[in-house]
UniProtKB/Swiss-Prot annotation:
Gene name linked to the record: Ij
Disruption phenotype: Plastids lose the ability to perform translation and lack plastid ribosomes.
Organism: Zea mays
Cellular compartments annotated: Plastid, Chloroplast
GO process terms (BP): negative regulation of ribosome biogenesis; negative regulation of translation
InterPro entries: Iojap/RsfS/C7orf30, NT_sf
Transit peptide extent on chain: 1-62
Residues making up the signal peptide according to the UniProt record: none
SUPFAM superfamilies reported for this sequence: Nucleotidyltransferase
Main location: plastid
Function as written in the Swiss-Prot or TrEMBL entry: May be a ribosome silencing factor (Potential). Involved in plastid biogenesis. Plastids affected by a mutation in Iojap lose the ability to perform translation and lack plastid ribosomes.
GO molecular function, one term: ribosomal large subunit binding
Protein name from the UniProt record: Protein Iojap, chloroplastic
Stored PANTHER family: IOJAP SUPERFAMILY ORTHOLOG, PROTEIN IOJAP, CHLOROPLASTIC
Domain of life: Eukaryota
Amino acid sequence: MGGTSAAVPSHGLACAPPAAVTLNPRARRRRASSGSGGHRSSPQQPLRSDLLPPATVACRARSQSASSSNVNFGRGDDADKLLEDLLKQHGEVVYSSGGPPDPTVEADDDAECLSFAVSLAKAASEIKATDIRVLCVRRLVYWTRFFIILTAFSNAQIDAISSKMRDIGEKQFSKVASGDTKPNSWTLLDFGDVVVHIFLPQQRAFYNLEEFYGNATPIELPFDTQRQ
């Protein structure tokens, strides 16, 4: 990740998907495509950091070729028929065994995660990080709710920011980060519902995550983010 010729690594981020998932029936024997969260359609208005409405997350049913399951559905027609039967029986929204999620519980979860994300962003600002962005990405990816993207200017600064964020996560929110333990040109801290991306300037410009996740909702932060 240190240079422009390096491939973007897979960090293996994972957390449980939201309890309510909208399932879109696919065309017969159509191959599943990758997620479309990375393309900008229209600019998003900043979202206040003290308010975040709950939302469902849409996903597409995967064809057998795109699935990692060991279940053998036989021919594609059989898989399509199975999907159609399930949709007729259960409808287009599949819930966990506990039933539909409580909107109040989802809102409380989002509020806690947002408070955590803003606390981490503020800590980065106090250690002189610049161009700090907090993005709500829960509609775009299944494995997290918020991204924090920021720029640092040395490995020592990255290390200080990472250490401060880990302390806040563990002591104030009982969250332990996985990911990079040493500073890199792109350092990642995965707290589950909040994922932090710390870049050196050249890598920040090259990977341009804000553009890739252009449909994410920006969070308005209650402090100066020193945007470039």
